[in-house]
Regions:
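Transmembrane beta-strands of outer-membrane beta-barrel pores
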Residues: 51-57, 89-95, 112-114, 125-129, ...
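Transmembrane beta-strands of outer-membrane beta-barrel proteins
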Residues: 45-49, 71, 85-89, 106, ...
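Residues that define the transmembrane beta-barrel architecture of outer-membrane proteins
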Residues: 43, 65-71, 100-104, 172-178, ...
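Outer-membrane beta-barrel "beta-signal"
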Residues: 324-347
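Short loop/turn motifs that connect adjacent beta-strands in outer-membrane beta-barrel proteins
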Residues: 33-44, 78-86, 98, 113-120, ...
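Cleavable N-terminal export/targeting peptides
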Residues: 1-42, 341-347
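Short glycine/proline- and aromatic-enriched beta-strand/turn motifs that initiate or cap beta-hairpins
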Residues: 26-30, 37-78, 88-95, 341
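Outer-membrane pore/translocation modules
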Residues: 62, 91, 97-211, 317-324
Length: 347
């Protein structure tokens, strides 16, 4: 009986140790259990600023080839990980023919993503407050859009300050565009895309505008600059800006001339290519931009207030004065920007 009792005690001890080990193991697993995931926060805000030596929009300088600053603020709402709603506003310093104080943009849209395809649909409004009208023919009762005594007075090259090039400018150049964009991420290094913008009254010229482009981007491997955290990319765009016929304000005003009551605004091609370097929230971009507009076509399209010399080579039915503008030619752009989001950078 003594031997049997000893065996029973030994078995009981082993069972107790085994049970204790299992319980301890369970306790250990429970002790390192991952915490529940943080609740999904659909709201975010993107914001940033930039400084550049020249503000160029679709191949045409908006700052008279002078430095410009910009800033933006964009609240976002993520319906889910693949659909984002957004609204935003931005500010750019400019030097426009109508002497507008600044460019103020208001925009909004939706960004759905399907795998490698990222879409963007929205409406963009371009506002140019503080402008002045210049047109010696836009006297009250002339029938020209935006006519006023001020238009005539401002157009005087002595008292109004307009160079003696005869160019016209409406007080308000504001307009809006609807747009659709797609970006295709082929892999970690290559992206291609396409854009489409349409306005029924581009730059308030009275002419419709349609812009379409194709884009491409190569992002260098993250190891290109070792462990420095510096990134690099090369990107480019080729686009076409189509334009309709202006209203009477921008006609040649030459009695009997075919374009007296409005000119066919010159459609054109534009392209840019550049290289950029990124570090944390900063991007330094070096870019070349150009168009196929002649100096005479550029003057007719932009009403460049700095155009001061005429040439027979620039004379045409839409530019009878023969003045030429360099606002649409080849230019180099250096831009330093900072881009942040609340979800990523403010936590």
């Amino acid at each position: 009986m003594g031997i049997v009792m000893k065996k029973m005690v030994l078995v009981a001890a082993v069972l107790a140790m085994t049970a204790g080990s299992s319980f301890a193991a369970d306790m250990a697993v429970k002790a390192v259990k991952a915490p529940p995931p943080a609740p999904f926060d659909p709201w975010d805000i993107a914001f940033g600023s930039a400084i550049m030596n020249d503000y160029v929009f679709r191949g045409v300088t908006q700052s008279n080839h002078k430095p410009s600053v910009a800033a933006y603020f964009e609240p976002r709402y993520n319906i889910n990980k693949d659909v984002q709603l957004y609204v935003g506003t931005s500010f750019e310093s400019i030097s426009f023919p109508n002497r507008a104080a600044a460019e103020v943009d208001i925009y909004g849209g939706i960004r759905p993503t399907f795998g490698m395809f990222a879409f963007d649909f929205g409406v963009w409004g371009y506002l140019y407050p503080g402008g002045t009208c210049f047109n010696a023919n836009a006297f009250p009762g002339s029938g020209l859009p935006g006519s006023s005594a001020g238009c005539v007075a401002n157009a005087d090259p002595i008292t109004g300050g307009l160079p003696i090039n005869g160019n016209f400018a409406k007080k308000d150049a504001s307009f809006y565009e609807g747009y659709a964009k797609v970006n295709v991420t082929l892999n970690d290094m290559f992206q291609i895309g396409a854009t489409e913008y349409y306005s029924p009254n581009f730059l308030n010229l009275g002419a419709w505008g349609n812009y379409a482009s194709i884009t491409g981007k190569f992002t260098a491997p993250s190891s290109t600059f070792g462990s420095s955290g510096i990134g690099m990319y090369v990107s480019g765009e080729f686009g076409r800006q189509w334009l309709g016929t202006s209203d009477r304000f921008y006609g040649t005003q030459i009695v009997g001339q075919i374009y007296q009551f409005g000119i066919p605004e010159p459609s054109y091609n534009t392209w840019n290519i550049g290289v950029g370097f990124t570090y944390k929230v900063f991007t330094l971009d070096f870019r070349y931009s150009d168009t196929n507009l002649s100096k005479g076509q550029c003057n007719a399209f932009t009403s460049d207030f700095t155009a001061s010399s005429a040439s027979p080579a620039n004379v045409s039915l839409i530019n009878p004065g023969g003045f030429g503008s360099n606002w649409c030619g080849a230019t180099g752009i250096v831009k330093l920007s900072a881009d942040l989001t609340a979800a990523t950078n403010l936590k």
